[in-house]
Regions:
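Short, ordered loop/turn segments at secondary-structure junctions
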Residues: 69-71, 272, 355, 368-369, ...
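Duplex nucleic acid-engaging cores and interfaces of nucleic-acid transaction enzymes
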Residues: 81-84, 95-105, 109-352, 356-460, ...
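Charged, low-complexity terminal tails
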Residues: 31, 48, 53-56, 67-111, ...
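Single conserved hydrophobic/aromatic residue that forms the stacking wall/gate
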Residues: 1-16
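Long, highly charged, low-complexity intrinsically disordered interaction regions
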Residues: 35, 94-111, 121, 456-554, ...
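A glycine-rich phosphate-binding loop feature that marks nucleotide/adenosyl-phosphate handling sites
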Residues: 210-218, 353-357, 415-416, 440-447, ...
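Single-stranded RNA-binding regions, centering on S1/OB-family and related RNA-binding modules
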Residues: 581-585, 589-753
């Protein structure tokens, strides 16, 4: 065994010298202490709160649970802060593991020095570690490696002491062998060795990378195959395109990447001559000032063009793509969150229409409780169906509206949507019906209709009817319906298929988890798809909960959840507070109060003279008394956590609120809008359907959504549309321009002078 400095500073750790493995666990503790400190400083959060948070998460707690039920331990950190802590700690853990691995790999080659070890230990980011490791990575044998094997390394070293080329030529004679037959071959081999040595220096790579990231220009041109592969000229904007990468927007980065991948564009990075000269002069400083300058420059040019720049360009393009992916995923996350948080239209009987041409419009009735009641088909497109079919469709429509007391008609926005909307608007007008309709984004409805969960819910119904049911339920409870569909099929992303799919999936899953746990779920009505996003519930357990309901009837109290197969004490702890039972035996089971805090709730109620039963029966009187109750004093006297008592107090004082109620209800319509009726300057209300980096797409009632470009959102400069617009938001806009031939409409929100 030997004593070695730990990777975290001055502490000493015991290491088995035969395996390079750290064998005393104390070093890992030191490493974590340093990580906690770094994260605390970066996020401006007390170090003990960072440590407490990570220990909870390491112990199996979920972010929603920690944020809501462990406020005293974390210092009342919210989900975003907890997520940031976790992300940074995971990065630093990976960094420390990579440092250990790199030290081991270099040591196995017998090339590890104290100086090299210290450089690795002091590295702050992964890229720094990789730059240090670069010369030691296993790679294909190069010409320089062959030159070294032929004994030319000493000659390469002479380039730093010789004064001119003649001196080098004389020295090179001593290196002539069977494998190196001439002076020229010897000099060429030595120059290759120097070029490779230059390319492997971490400080050069780091500086050149910085210059490329800050100053390089990306250039795209149409490939030779462009005319053949891009008939619709989708990439026309990039056929002769250049831009500084520092200013390049994420959607343009991803568009260029896709065009290159499809062999439509050729792409490369270019440096200004002044930046190239700056790099060459930086490297030239390592050589002496003498008559070999021209030779040194030749070596530097070879090292840059053949070895450094191709590698750095790949790294920079990857960094550029990663930046674009992060921004694209962030846009998707915001859009998905706002889509899931759309206000539900509760207790409304819905007639759902999934438009179609030849096969007709599929119709489903969904009652106000979300239950499917009946289905039929309307043939209503005048250009395709005969007058009798259209008349029959009108009669069926009116009969269903009367029979089920329909409140809202929900129309999918896909094929034949415009004709279906015209049909509905005309019937409402002709019959003076007190009825509204809305156009629903049906993206993903067909994916749902063919899914396993749809087959489980409606085994006896055709896939087309299931799609109509989804369109209807989406307005009654968007969250409950949309969680059944892969979020990538919902249609609110930007270049979503061009980003890292595992990162995208993880990010979107986190968004769904955040929203679902924020809203909570009724354990007696929620689908397994919704339940699977609740804290502590995996898909198998979610299905077991639904199965338990079928076999035993509704859950009567939260304790009963422990009877479900796969639910142990830890899982129960994580999920219980997020599952509610409105008609349960215990009124607290319909609140956000966690079962572990029921004793606090009962003690608090006792202080105002109420038992749980009395509180349930005399709710208004109990809440009147609670208004004047000093819960802070109560927490101090009983040594209860102040944050927990505050949450318990507020839950007893008010009904459980649905955060979605704070969002605008969808825009209901009774008449149709036609592009021919639009005039520049006309004011309208619209619903934001998608927010992207260059603006937002707004549903103003036409077949296609209109574009509100980022430059038209405000008179003030807007750098990010998502800061002022959200999916589902209802906004007032004016018509800026109309292209009737292409069916395109431009909007503005700018104030008029």
């Amino acid at each position: 065994y030997e004593i070695m400095p730990s990777l975290v500073g001055s502490e000493m750790c015991i290491r088995d010298s035969t395996s390079s493995m750290i064998i005393n666990k104390k070093c890992k503790g030191y490493a974590m202490e340093k990580i906690y400190k770094i994260v605390a400083e970066e996020l401006k959060i007390p170090v003990d709160k960072v440590e407490n948070t990570i220990k909870l998460l390491d112990d199996g707690a979920t972010i929603p649970f920690v944020a809501r039920y462990r406020k005293e331990i974390t210092g009342n950190l919210d989900e975003v802060q907890i997520g940031d802590i976790l992300q940074k700690v995971e990065y630093l853990r990976n960094l420390e593991e990579r440092k250990e691995e790199v030290i081991r790999l270099i040591e196995e080659q017998g090339k590890l020095t104290d100086e090299l070890r210290n450089s690795i230990v002091e590295a702050k980011i992964l890229q720094e570690v990789e730059d240090i490791y670069f010369p030691y990575r296993k790679k294909k044998k190069t010409k320089a490696d062959i030159a070294k094997e032929r004994g030319l390394e000493p000659l390469a070293e002479k380039f730093y002491t010789a004064n001119n080329l003649e001196e080098i030529q004389n020295l090179a004679k001593d290196f002539i062998t069977e494998e190196v037959p001439t002076v020229e071959d010897a000099i060429e081999g030595a120059m290759l060795i120097i070029a490779q040595n230059i390319s492997e220096k971490a400080e050069y790579r780091e500086r050149i990378r910085e210059i490329y990231l800050k100053s390089s220009i990306i250039e795209a041109k149409a490939s030779k195959k462009a005319a053949e592969l891009d008939e619709k000229k989708v990439y026309n904007d990039y056929y002769e395109y250049s831009e500084k990468i520092e200013k390049m927007a994420s959607h343009r980065i991803l568009a260029v990447n896709r065009g290159e991948k499809e062999d439509i564009l050729t792409v490369h990075l270019r440096l200004e001559d002044s930046d190239r000269e700056k790099i060459e002069n930086m490297i030239l400083k390592e050589f002496p000032k003498n008559d070999l300058v021209a030779t040194y420059k030749e070596i530097i040019k070879d090292s840059l063009d053949r070895l450094i720049i191709p590698s750095i360009e790949r790294e920079v393009r990857n960094a550029l793509t990663e930046r674009a992916e992060i921004e694209s995923i962030a846009v998707f996350k915001d859009n998905l969150k706002n889509l899931l948080l759309q206000a539900p239209l509760k207790e409304k009987n819905v007639l759902a229409l999934d438009p179609g041409y030849r096969t007709g419009c599929k119709v489903a009735v969904i009652d106000k409780y979300g239950f499917y009641r009946e289905n039929t088909v309307f043939f209503l497109v005048e250009a395709m169906h005969n007058p009798k079919q259209i008349e029959d469709a009108k009669k069926k429509f009116l009969a269903l509206v009367k029979k089920y007391e329909i409140d809202i008609v929900s129309i999918g926005n896909g094929t034949a949507s415009r004709e279906t909307e015209t049909f509905v608007a005309n019937i409402i007008k002709e019959n003076k019906l007190n009825l509204k309709y809305l156009i629903v984004n049906e993206a993903g409805a067909s994916v749902y209709s063919a899914s396993k969960i749809a087959a489980e819910e409606f085994p006896d119904l055709d896939v087309t009817v299931r799609g109509a049911i989804s369109i209807g339920r989406r307005i009654q409870d968007p969250l409950a319906e949309l969680v059944k569909i892969d979020p990538k099929s919902i249609g609110v992303g930007m270049y979503q298929h061009d980003v890292n799919q595992s990162k995208l999936d993880e990010s979107l899953d986190n968004v769904i988890s955040h929203v679902v746990n924020n809203v909570g779920a009724n354990i007696n009505t929620a689908s397994w798809a919704l339940l699977s996003h609740i804290s502590g519930i995996k898909k198998t357990v979610a299905k077991n909960i639904v199965e338990y309901r079928k076999e035993n009837g509704n859950f009567k109290n939260r304790k009963e959840i422990l009877k479900v197969k796969g639910v142990g004490p830890k899982a129960y702890e994580q999920m219980a507070g997020f599952l509610v039972i409105p008609e349960g035996e215990n009124i607290l089971d319909n609140t956000v109060i966690h079962p572990e805090s029921y004793a606090i709730a009962e003690a608090l109620l006792e202080k105002i003279g109420f038992s749980l039963e009395k509180y349930n029966n005399e709710l208004n009187e109990a809440r009147e008394r609670l208004k004047s109750f000093d819960y802070k004093k109560f927490a101090e006297e009983n040594n209860f956590g102040a944050e927990t008592v505050k949450d318990v107090y507020e839950a007893l004082l008010k009904d459980r609120r649905d955060p979605r109620d704070d969002f605008e209800k969808p825009l209901l319509k009774s008449d149709i809008l036609n592009i021919d009726n639009l005039e520049v300057g006309m004011e309208l209300e619209g619903t934001v359907r998608n927010v992207v980096k260059f603006g937002a797409f707004v549903d103003i009632g036409l077949k296609n959504d209109a574009l509100l470009h980022i430059s038209e959102i405000s008179n003030k400069y807007i750098d990010d549309p998502s800061k002022v617009l959200a999916v589902g938001q209802i906004i007032k806009v004016r018509i800026k321009d109309v292209d009737k031939d292409r069916g395109r409409v431009g909007l503005t929100k700018k104030e008029q002078n």
